[in-house]
Amino acid sequence: MSKKQTNTKGWSGHDADQWMAVAHMSGKRGVKGMCLKTCRLAWQIPAKYPSAIVAWNNTPKKHKFTDPMKAPVGVTHFWKGGKFGHVAIQSSKPGYVWTTDLPIKDTVGKIYYTGVTDAWGSIYLGWTTQLNGVDLNV
């Protein structure tokens, strides 16, 4: 039996939310097309999957949920679209996510979750309590 993986810093969803807020306020750049990496960094967890859609497809069903308005702070939201899909982090404001490339390309921003679909035509899949095989502390 494998050992349950948790993030190495013991961070909570609020810590991930704050990490993204700081990235936004500092004008962090160089995140274009790096949604999965940015979310991993916010949670301080290692790389595992090559894209957001692969991460979603490898997340066990018991960690997947569909109502975005019930998402706790810090969970990861996923969309299907393009070659790699998209992932973002739930902010402390219900329905709003921290994301890369929206509303401004190559930066971290906070938008209403439907903004990903509106901007790119991506299909909302749901949110998870696990990322890259690591249980999120939410």
Regions found by a protein language model. Give the residues of each.
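N-terminal capping segments
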Residues: 1-51, 57-60
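Aromatic- and glycine-rich peptidoglycan recognition patches
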Residues: 3-27, 90-138
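...with weaker cross-activation on analogous glycine-rich loops/strands in unrelated enzymes
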Residues: 48-113
